[in-house]
């Protein structure tokens, strides 16, 4: 939702302050396929394995989401 940096619904999330819906100090992310222990995963880390004719998707090191490989 507008103004939220993370989902307030899970008070057990160590990356998110459930009272403010903001990331805790030092956290880069709270969830996502490329978020590990509140930090963005390293660029080149596989976040979605290829199936069939598909190709692997990789973390970009600057976001928590798993961007689709442009060669799909």
UniProtKB/Swiss-Prot annotation:
What is the reported tissue distribution?
Answer: Expressed by the venom gland.
Q: What else is known?
A: The disintegrin belongs to the medium disintegrin subfamily.
Q: The Disintegrin domain covers which part of the protein?
A: 1-72
Checking SMART domains in the record gives: DISIN
Per its record, how is this protein called by name?
Disintegrin sasaimin
Alphabetized UniProt keyword annotations? Cell adhesion impairing toxin, Disulfide bond, Hemostasis impairing toxin, Platelet aggregation inhibiting toxin, Secreted, Toxin
The entry's family comment says: Belongs to the venom metalloproteinase (M12B) family. P-II subfamily. P-IIa sub-subfamily.
Secreted listed as a keyword: yes
Annotated Gene3D superfamilies:
Disintegrin domain
**GO BP annotation list:** venom-mediated suppression of platelet aggregation
Molecular functions per Gene Ontology = toxin activity
Note the InterPro entries from the entry: Disintegrin_dom, Disintegrin_dom_sf
Function comment:
Inhibits ADP- (IC(50)=66 nM) and collagen-induced (IC(50)=100 nM) aggregation of human platelets. In vitro, inhibits adhesion of endothelial cells to vitronectin, type-I collagen and, to a lower degree, fibronectin and laminin.
KW Secreted (keyword) present = yes
Which residue ranges does the UniProt annotation give for the motif Cell attachment site? 51-53
Give the species this sequence originates from: Cerrophidion sasai (Costa Rica montane pitviper)
Q: List the disulfide bonds.
A: 6-21, 8-16, 15-38, 29-35, 34-59, 47-66
SUPFAM superfamilies recorded: Blood coagulation inhibitor (disintegrin)
Assembly description: Monomer.
Q: Where in the cell is it found?
A: Secreted
Name a GO CC annotation attached to this entry.
extracellular region
Coarse class of the protein's main subcellular location: secreted
């Amino acid at each position: 939702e507008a103004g939220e940096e993370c989902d307030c619904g899970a008070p057990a999330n160590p990356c998110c302050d459930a009272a403010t819906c903001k990331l805790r100090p030092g956290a880069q992310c709270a969830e996502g396929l490329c978020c590990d222990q509140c930090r963005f995963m390293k660029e080149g880390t596989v976040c979605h394995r290829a199936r069939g004719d598909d190709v692997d998707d990789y973390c970009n090191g600057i976001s928590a989401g798993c961007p689709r490989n442009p060669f799909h």
